[in-house]
Amino acid sequence: WELPAIDPDDDGAADYAGPLLSDIDFGAFSHSALVRIADEVCLQMHLLNLSFVLAVSKRAGDDKELATSICTRQLTGIAGVAAERISRALGLSADLDGLATVLRLHPLLNPAGYVAADVNDGRLRVWRSAAHDDGAWISLCSPGSLRPLQAIATAIDPHLKVEITGTDSVWTAEFQHCDTPAEDYPEVQVAKVSGGARFDFQPRRSLPLTVL
């Protein structure tokens, strides 16, 4: 798939042209450019993850089960932290509506042109896509692998429980309210120790740089 083109007539900067600055001023870009930047970040993130998968697979050798287990643990930790950060940043409600918004924006289902999925009526439907062919994050979720999606649900509301039906690459996840709250998985607890999990973007003025 191809990323959408930036509208040069949209208000704000449409590219990186101009003086060399000390930092990126996101507020200077047009809406169209910011959408493209977000898509590029999602793409870069998935490329980094695929490099992680290749490295783990090389170290695991013939033990594919071990490699899958390690990659799933990594996803579970990141999934829970990312869901919590998205929800907090957007001030979303701790219910199915808030969960639906988080899922649509979550790295697990993005870039949207890469992962075939639909979120509606408290359900997440997934079909086989290029992401499955590449062994990306979504390929680690299935009826037999609930933890990444449960980590997302728990981050929004500990009373939400996920059930998945279908095959390894074509499945439906349903989220329902339960009486007993779930606790964060150990993978999520470990991920929260990272300083990156607590990082917040702050408005900063970009200063011009002079190359000598």
What kind of feature is each model-predicted range?
Residues 126:
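Phosphate-moiety recognition in structured ligand-binding domains
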Residues 1-123, 132-148, 154-212:
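N-terminal accessory segment detector
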